[in-house]
């Protein structure tokens, strides 16, 4: 069996985000590659980290008050050094990692979001958890642990879960952003151009935790995977049909990222 080791995107490896953001996001998202890159400012990254850390500590205050001081003493990228004090798998369901409305308003005020709005016009952020407000979810991926997402296309979830909410006359576009990350080593992996090859990239549906989950029906090691070299504050805007998944974290820090789905006018679909 052939093995394709993931490659680091050359432009991203050189830290070149300008070539991606100088032209419209949509040109690449619905173009040949299916994705594009950009960055937020250092002050915006600090603000975002503050929102996530506040919710992270509040959750720990609720489930493990006796250990909160130990978590408070470390940066989130060092979470793994004290994570054995809690039951990681039990205390971090997705519903506990959705930012509150106040943080969503803060993200919407950031320069990168204003750029998205200047191109796409009115944007709605998805509410996958049906909380009643827009959902931006953060993730913790500890070193050398199996808590990374498998290869999939987000569109598959709409196909296996008919009740998943879409918006009439609008199309979904995905945003993934590195909050704490080592460029090209523990971020996001993807298959360039796969959004146009639904004829060869198939999936099967499995029931996990009483929910239908789409699973790539093939060998991941045979995929031509690319790892864009995302530093903290870098983001990827990508097509909802693009194959992607988390990178195995072989570094010595915890990866923290956010992701969310925006809905834009269907006229942007090529």
Residue ranges of predicted features:
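N-terminal auxiliary "cap/dimerization" subdomain that precedes the catalytic jelly-roll/cupin core
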Residues: 1-124
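A structural signal for short, well-ordered beta-strand segments and their strand-loop junctions
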Residues: 36-39, 126-137, 178, 187-191, ...
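Active-site rim elements
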Residues: 100-103, 221-224, 246-247
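Exposed beta-sheet edge/beta-hairpin loop segments within beta-rich domains
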Residues: 103-106, 229, 249
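Conserved double-stranded beta-helix
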Residues: 115-187
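Short, solvent-exposed loop/turn segments at secondary-structure junctions
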Residues: 143, 156, 180-184, 195-196, ...
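Double-stranded beta-helix
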Residues: 183-243
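Non-heme Fe(II)/2-oxoglutarate
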Residues: 235-237, 242-270
